[in-house]
A protein has these predicted regions:
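N-terminal targeting segments with Sec-dependent signals, encompassing both cleavable signal peptides
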Residues: 1-375, 379-394, 400, 404-408, ...
Length: 426
């Protein structure tokens, strides 16, 4: 016969907290990083020919240099396209400016086509033109120190018709002279943009480099490498290497702590997380430290860490786990709603929502001994004794320490004289 027990299900938060969702410090690795290089070609008034002096400008020379780099290293660079946006300043007739802007578009595109041909580099050139660049005009005007700036801005807001705008602005004789020398020349232009990607190492290349010499990898590549395996030992090895190569980065320490929590190595987890916190006191680290505190039964300390993890993606789950520990079961179930974890199921059991608990347990991603144990509790509380014994047998087969807990758990009181139950817990 089993000795008189106590209702022990509520104390299981110490165990379920260990397989709650931890938070890893994510890598920022990108295989392809979007880049762009811009240049500007300026034109003389009413002209569309590209002057040699413009091709010698720093911006154009830098753009050509980037095109050469892309051509010479197509493993590291990948061109997307080239954009050409040509403009005419907003003086003169709309018809004339439309034709002028189009000619500027064509002349700048022709220059690029020649450069690409000489380099034997393929790229799409997307072109467009704006007949009268009123937006650019307004932007430059607002940033200027022109005396009549506010008056001209009011004219722009009062008149939508381009030709009427020009008439009104020309009436400001002194103001227009300043515009003609300071603003309008800047609008007679074509903007060239090379869009390309910086290409990083592939998954296979990162893994190969890790094996040959991990020190050659960036911290982002190392952290990313850990995501390429599901094996916990391999992850730990990569994170340990990362702490050696990049000791100032908190993420690898934090992630080692997260793995240690899942493995039930709380002292090891505490050590890693303490080191992580010394590098950066952030939500991810505090979330994991809260779970350790809950697993150790230190509710007050857990509450402190939870309060410092408000931006964590698992904040609601942390609050739910904390409320289970504090005995606020209805609030806990509400905070954990939708979380497919043992803690969520525990909260639902303690809030006596057995249907929800059963559904949650059937959807736990990495079901373990505690999942089976909680299934046994649900079955026992709903009068399904045979199912309770079956699930309890599965739980004890995975974690023999649950024998002692089951033997004293009054949720199984109706089984205390059941021979199958007695054989399981003896």
């Amino acid at each position: 016969k089993v000795a008189n027990g106590v209702v022990a299900t509520s104390t299981l938060i110490k165990k379920t907290a260990q397989d709650a969702n931890t938070v890893v410090g994510k890598d920022a690795y990108q295989y392809a990083i979007a880049q762009s290089q811009q240049a500007q070609i300026k034109y003389l008034i009413n002209q569309a020919n590209v002057r040699t002096s413009e091709l010698k400008s720093v911006s154009v020379q830098d753009l050509v240099k980037v095109l050469r780099e892309i051509k010479n290293d197509q493993k590291s660079f990948q061109i997307d396209n080239i954009e050409v946006s040509a403009y005419a300043s907003p003086e003169g007739s709309l018809k004339f400016n439309t034709a002028l802007a189009e000619k500027r578009q064509n002349s700048s595109a022709k220059f690029l086509q020649g450069e690409l041909k000489n380099m034997e580099l393929d790229a799409d050139i997307n072109t467009k033109y704006t007949a009268e660049d009123w937006d650019g005009f307004q932007e430059l005007l607002m940033a200027s120190n022109l005396q009549d700036k506010e008056v001209i801005l009011r004219v722009l807001s009062m008149y939508e018709d381009p030709e009427e705008r020009e008439v009104q602005i020309r009436n400001l004789s002194a103001g227009f002279e300043e515009l003609a020398t300071e603003i309008l020349p800047e609008l007679r232009r074509a903007r060239l943009t090379v869009n390309y990607n910086l290409i990083g190492r592939s998954d296979d290349e990162i893994q190969a480099q890790y094996k040959s010499n991990a020190k050659e990898l960036s911290v982002e590549e190392l952290l990313y490498a850990a995501t390429l395996t599901e094996d916990a030992n391999e992850k730990k090895d990569i994170y340990a290497t990362t702490t050696n190569v990049y000791p100032a980065d908190y993420r690898a320490y934090n992630n080692l702590g997260a793995i240690s929590i899942a493995e039930g190595n709380l002292e090891v987890a505490k050590n890693y997380l303490k080191q992580a916190a010394s590098k950066k006191d952030c939500a991810e680290v505090n979330a994991n430290r809260a779970l350790v505190a809950l697993a150790e039964g230190n509710t007050e300390e857990a509450e402190t860490f939870v309060s410092r993890a408000t931006s964590s993606p698992v904040y609601n789950e942390l609050v739910g786990n904390l409320n289970v520990a504090k005995g606020n079961y209805a609030a806990a179930a509400q905070s954990l709603a939708g979380a497919k974890t043992n803690s969520a199921a525990l909260a639902e059991i303690l809030a006596k929502n057995y249907t929800a608990a059963e559904k949650t347990l059937n959807n736990v991603k990495n079901a373990d001994a505690m999942t089976d144990y909680l299934k046994a509790v649900v079955a026992a509380r709903t009068g399904k004794n045979n199912e309770a014994v079956k699930n309890l047998a599965n739980a004890i087969a995975k974690d023999a320490s649950l024998k002692a807990h089951a033997a004293k758990n009054l949720d199984f009181v109706t089984l205390f004289n059941d021979s199958a139950f007695l054989n399981l817990v003896k």
